[in-house]
A protein has these predicted regions:
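Beta1/beta-strand and adjacent pyrophosphate-binding region of the FAD-binding site
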Residues: 2-17
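A conserved short coil-to-beta-strand element within the FAD-binding core of flavoproteins
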Residues: 127-142
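Core beta-strand elements of the Rossmann-like FAD/NAD(P) dinucleotide-binding domain
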Residues: 5-7, 149-158
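Glycine-rich Rossmann-fold phosphate-binding loop(s) that bind the pyrophosphate
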Residues: 14-15, 37, 107
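Active-site-adjacent segment of FAD-dependent monooxygenases/related oxidoreductases
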Residues: 43-121, 132-135
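Glycine-rich FAD pyrophosphate-binding loop
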Residues: 24-47
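Short hydrophobic core segments
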Residues: 11-12, 106, 154-160
Length: 160
């Protein structure tokens, strides 16, 4: 395997957390690489809602409006038993936030929005790339990656 110098941070995984971390790194000038073993972002969702504090965080990245436009606000929860409403709970009461309600937005859409945001800034998610081995060292981490073109050993200060 070829050893290659790399960025300060290697992000393994381009799901919502990895993509958000990449956006934060880009915003703050931290050098990074982001890799994912999948050929594209997921078309399946493991999560359907984005809550107030997440929208507040996305606002700091300049993304809140795009997410709000793509999602559907949830203002109340309705519980039913055999088709009969048994309870209704307002979701927004007591939330001290500029975004007082959660939004329904499939995880696949979340990943697509974050991916487009990063691509517009020139960030490339290295797809079809997976970690084979991780070796912590005294002042860095070595990670063996399997890529479509072969294997690569990456040295990085931090691993996420």
């Amino acid at each position: 395997m070829s050893a290659s110098p790399t960025a300060d941070l290697l992000i393994l995984g381009a799901g919502p957390v990895g993509l958000t971390l990449a956006a934060e790194c880009r915003k703050h000038g931290i050098s990074f690489r982001i890799v994912d073993q999948n050929p594209t972002h997921s078309v399946y969702s493991k999560a359907l809602a984005i809550w107030s504090n997440t929208i507040e965080h996305l606002a700091g990245l300049g993304l809140a409006e795009k997410f709000l436009e793509a999602g559907c606000p949830v203002r109340r929860g309705i519980f039913q038993d055999n088709g009969k409403k048994i309870a209704e709970i307002p979701i927004t009461e007591g939330l001290d936030s500029p975004y007082p309600q959660p939004f329904v937005l499939p995880q696949s859409d979340t990943e697509a929005l974050l991916g487009r945001h990063l691509a517009a800034q020139g960030v490339i998610v290295e797809r079809n790339t997976r970690a084979l081995d991780v070796r912590p060292q005294e002042d860095h981490v070595e990670v063996d990656l399997q890529k479509p073109g072969g294997a690569e050993t990456v040295r990085t200060r931090w691993l996420a």
